[in-house]
Amino acid sequence: MSEEQQVQPQLALERIYTKDISFEVPGAQVFTKQWQPELNINLSSAAEKIDPTHFEVSLKVVVQANNDNETAFIVDVTQSGIFLIDNIEEDRLPYILGAYCPNILFPFLREAVNDLVTKGSFPQLLLTPINFDAEFEANMQRAQAAAVEGQA
């Protein structure tokens, strides 16, 4: 066999961990009021190359719950994973880092947020599942449209 035939693509989750976590309840008066929260949820992802075959991919969510115009709680969680990515076509890397890996991390992030909120004595907060594949595709289309617009 030639060397080319022996080289197999590798994609594996080697480690998953909570990189950063915070839960704040600014004031106890929130527990004396009827619970009708307004939620502000911000989610972002990032990827960093650690070495030639490893990437750290992180999902970060910040949830602020306001009740009766007061901050009830703020949750800030960054869930990360170390992924082995080797012998993968370069043009597939953005999809893997921007959609495939976040799809793996999201259930862990969702569980961490819910655990913090319920341990903080609030009703459970289950983040709505996200289709990172669709988000990635939409971002690619926006980038292509912006590039075409910039050339016009």
Swiss-Prot record:
Its main location: cytoplasm. NCBIfam families: PRK05751.1-4 (NF004393), secB (TIGR00809). GO terms for cellular component: cytoplasm. It is found in: Cytoplasm. Belongs to the SecB family. The gene is secB. One of the proteins required for the normal export of preproteins out of the cell cytoplasm. It is a molecular chaperone that binds to a subset of precursor proteins, maintaining them in a translocation-competent state. It also specifically binds to its receptor SecA. GO terms for molecular function: unfolded protein binding. Homotetramer, a dimer of dimers. One homotetramer interacts with 1 SecA dimer. PANTHER family: PROTEIN-EXPORT PROTEIN SECB, PTHR36918. One of its GO terms (biological process) is protein transport. This is Protein-export protein SecB. The keyword Oxidoreductase does not apply. Keywords: Chaperone, Cytoplasm, Protein transport, Translocation, Transport.
